[in-house]
A protein has these predicted regions:
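Ser/Thr-rich, Proline-interspersed low-complexity disordered segments
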Residues: 19-63, 82
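Short solvent-exposed coil/turn linkers within tandem alpha-helical repeat scaffolds
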Residues: 51, 84-93, 121-132, 157-168, ...
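Residue-level recognition of tetratricopeptide repeat
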Residues: 65, 102, 139, 175, ...
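Catalytic glycan-binding domains that act on GlcNAc-containing polysaccharides
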Residues: 404-409, 418-423, 427-428, 434, ...
């Protein structure tokens, strides 16, 4: 054991001195105080599985790779272990160890992961992944707090695989050294990261260097770095951070005047930055006077509403004649404190006293991010009448203001929310009558028509829809109004006229929601009706050959242009880095590189096409779809309907059946049409298993709280954590289960189930109660634009799948 340790130390020393030739066997790094045991064919520490007939080790590796891609770690462990146990091939065994190490790392079984990666690097040093094992060991050591060992592992990786992801690996190495208290080597690593052209966030690494310099006592260098970052950036948040960090250095140097000058500068200039609040706290603690207006702003944006209130009050008391901005923010502080009545009164005073203030129009209404009077009245105080009257008063007082038609439209929405449907319809009529040039006119007339349809006043509704149809200039608006003209004529018993309207609607855009629903009406087909059979017998090789030829002809490429490989892209540093990151399991970093490369080649149709195919082969569906879409855009196929004229290869990828080995069983288990679930998944994440928007995560965009709720109810997966949402197996399993619950709750109504999935079951229930059994009316009554568009978009996706995969007679 001692010999092994000495050998490791000697190799590491040679690497650090730059003396390791490319052909050297990869040195091993010990994961602990003892050499870990090797995984042997008789090892029983992992589960074994012997299917019949017995797959070959090569087939088991393929199965395991598919399983790890799907987040099915149990199957991956079994298959990798079986491949190792049943093969004498060094290549197979090395691949199995690499797979086992990755899975154990993913499930945070760090001890086993280190043992496995150690075995790979020591027993199979010529394997392509033996060097990568050192990077993963570095990640694991860092997670365990064994930072010196982490730094050494990164060092070996960089020495044996230089010039690939140096910027990233050097930064990780620097972080490990810094955490270990070795700031000198940390600075060296960080500087190496900065020197690499692949650096992603240069200021962040520069800050790390400066912080290490401070710890080493070199404050002069650190201050110089902060000043250079400040001078080079236009980002106010970064400028505030530099002011704060510089000021903190001056405090440690015993130069408080210099420090407070920096702190005052950030408070006065960058009120939105939280670092400005940290500077403010330092100033307050030191008793340094400052402008109360700026102090109040910093406090407000830091969420310190009580302190903000006091600062604004002092400013107002000291400056009774001012422009009113302090009064405006005073109202916002009341709102932040939950004193909604006081906030409304404060906005009242501001509105009456400061009509020339730039915040005057916003104060009348507001929104979720920056509330105002009407928003607070209806959303927090349930004063719908008063809120609507606030907005109507604004229109009366400022009829020429750019916000007037917007507020008039919103007043109608508030009246509708309050059940005053006749008033709402008349208010929406006013938008068209008083602001005929507004872009809001088509939707205002449409909403007026929907109100009259709900009231059973079909003749009046028909007039509103017809007027909307005449004034609409956007095809989608025209399809919307024509569809409802047909619905209204049908309600009036005018069947022939309704059929004519729907025929006209269907012809506008066969991929649009309203055109699709018109097609449904013409054949008496309910929304989301399943295909009797899904045809998945495509020939991707033949389809790609057709697409290759089409790309050559469409973009005037020479007949011998090779589109079968990535070509020169294989030498592109971004593609090389992205592929390496992906192999290491760093999908987010890989995505950054692939996205950047997609942007770089976006005007080159051949390279866009090559990149799309390459990314598809890696299972990077999200960026691949964007690359293929860009090819169609360059071919002047900007609309969805225009893409139908392209070779089917493009749309079979853009609307692919990805993750089908998980999705089909999950759909069958929960009683869903697989196309329906696939459409939801495409809408939610565009097949990006690491999608993260707001609080929602994964393929099915489940929030952590909802995920925990579903997992608790199902008792699956075992030991559930939020990170499991990024596993396709878990995301699809939980998502389909939750959708099934909503479908059951709403008696099989899929549109309402989707609304519940997106906006919550309580809101969906309210909308369904208002609409009754009419699904089309339900969609229009939905009060959240996001949810309404969500259902429409999913049905458009569903329509594409239906047209692409319907069985050909």
């Amino acid at each position: 054991m001692k010999i092994k340790r000495l050998f490791f130390g000697a190799c590491l020393g040679a690497i650090l001195m730059g003396c390791v030739p490319a052909s050297v066997s990869t040195p091993a790094i010990t994961p602990g105080s003892t050499i870990p045991p090797a995984i042997t064919p008789n090892d029983t520490s992992l589960p074994t599985f012997t299917p019949s007939p017995t797959p070959t080790p090569e087939a088991r590796i393929d199965t395991a790779e598919a399983a790890i891609f799907n987040g099915n770690y149990d199957t991956a462990l079994v298959e990798y272990q079986a491949a190792f146990d049943n093969s004498v091939s060094p290549e197979i065994r090395a691949a199995a160890l690499w797979g086992l190490g990755r899975v154990e790392h993913a499930i945070k079984n760090n001890g086993a992961a280190l043992e496995t990666l150690w075995q790979l690097s020591s027993q199979y040093p010529t394997s392509p992944n033996a060097v990568r094992a050192y990077f993963l060991m570095g990640e694991i050591y860092k997670a365990l707090g064994r930072n010196e060992e982490a730094a050494k592992a990164y060092t070996i990786y960089l020495a044996l695989r230089p010039g690939i992801i140096d910027a990233y690996a050097q930064e990780q190495r620097g972080d490990a050294y810094a955490a270990a208290g070795n700031d000198t080597d940390a600075i060296t690593a960080y500087k190496a990261a900065l020197a690499d052209p692949g650096i992603e966030d240069s200021p962040a690494v520069q800050v790390k260097i400066a912080q290490a310099d401070v710890r080493l006592g070199d404050t002069t260098t650190a201050l110089g770095i902060y000043d250079s970052i400040y001078a080079a950036t236009s980002n106010d948040y970064l400028k505030a951070q530099m002011d704060l960090l510089s000021g903190q250095i001056y405090l440690t140097l015993g130069q408080p005047d210099q420090a407070y000058q920096r702190f005052l500068h950030t408070v006065d200039n960058y009120p939105l930055a939280y670092d400005s609040y940290s500077a403010l706290v330092a100033l307050v603690n030191a008793g340094i006077p400052m402008d109360d207006m700026n102090r109040g702003l910093v406090d407000y944006f830091a969420g310190q509403y009580g302190y903000a209130h006091d600062a604004f009050q002092r400013y107002i008391d000291a400056n009774p004649k001012n422009d009113g901005t302090a009064d405006y923010y005073m109202a916002l502080t009341y709102f932040g404190l939950g004193q909604y009545e006081a906030a409304v009164q404060a906005w009242d005073g501001f509105i009456k006293g400061y009509p020339d203030n730039p915040h005057w129009a916003a104060a009348w209404n507001g929104n979720a991010s920056l509330p105002g009077r009407a928003y607070t009245q209806w959303y927090y105080l349930s004063q719908y009448d008063l809120a609507a009257q606030t907005l109507l008063t604004f229109v009366k007082q400022a009829p020429t203001d750019a916000n007037a038609p917007i507020y008039l439209q919103e007043a109608g929405r508030l009246q509708e929310r309050n059940g005053k449907l006749e008033e709402a319809a008349l208010t929406w009529d006013r938008v068209a009558d008083e602001y005929p040039g507004s872009d809001l006119v088509p939707q205002a007339l449409f909403q007026a028509g929907i109100i009259r349809y709900r009231l059973g006043k079909y003749s009046d509704a028909l007039i509103s829809f017809q007027r909307d149809s005449i004034l609409s200039t956007v095809l989608e608006d025209q399809a919307q109004s024509l569809f409802w003209i047909g619905k209204t004529q049908s309600a009036l018993g005018e069947a022939s006229a309704a059929q004519a309207a729907w025929l006209q609607t269907a012809a506008i855009d066969p991929t649009d929601y309203y055109s699709l629903r018109a097609q449904d009406m013409l054949v008496n087909r309910p929304i989301f009706e399943s295909l009797p059979v899904v045809n998945l017998n495509q020939d991707p090789t033949a389809e790609r050959a057709v697409a290759d030829s089409w790309v050559r002809v469409t973009f005037n490429l020479t007949p011998d242009t090779d589109l079968s490989t990535p070509g020169s892209l294989l030498a592109d540093p971004q593609l090389i880095r992205g592929t390496e990151f992906l192999t290491l399991g760093l999908d987010t970093q890989a995505g950054i590189e692939f996205d950047a490369l997609g942007t770089a080649v976006e005007q080159n149709p051949a390279d866009c096409y090559r990149l799309g195919n390459y990314l598809l082969s890696l299972g990077q569906y999200y960026p691949a779809i964007f690359a293929f879409r860009q090819v169609l855009t360059l071919a002047k196929m900007s609309t969805q309907s225009q893409t139908l004229a392209a070779p089917v290869y493009f749309n079979h990828i853009r609307y692919g059946f990805f993750y089908r080995d998980i999705l089909f069983p999950a759909a069958q288990k929960t009683g869903f049409d697989p196309i329906f679930v696939m459409s939801v998944m495409r809408q939610e994440s565009l097949f990006n298993k690491y999608a993260n928007s707001g609080y929602a995560q994964g393929l099915m965009q489940i929030t952590p709280g909802t995920g925990q709720f579903i997992a608790d109810n199902l008792g699956w997966p075992p030991n559930y954590t939020t990170d499991d949402l990024y596993r396709p197996l878990v995301s699809i399993g939980l998502g389909t289960s939750y959708l099934m619950d909503q479908r059951l709750r709403f008696n099989g109504d899929l549109a309402t189930a989707l609304a519940a999935y997106n906006a919550g079951p309580d809101a969906a229930a309210i909308w369904r109660d208002l609409s009754g059994p009419d699904t089309d009316l339900f969609v229009e009554i939905i009060r959240f634009d996001e949810t309404r568009n969500y259902i429409r978009s999913i049905y458009e996706i569903y329509g594409m799948y239906r047209s692409l995969y319907a069985t050909v007679p």
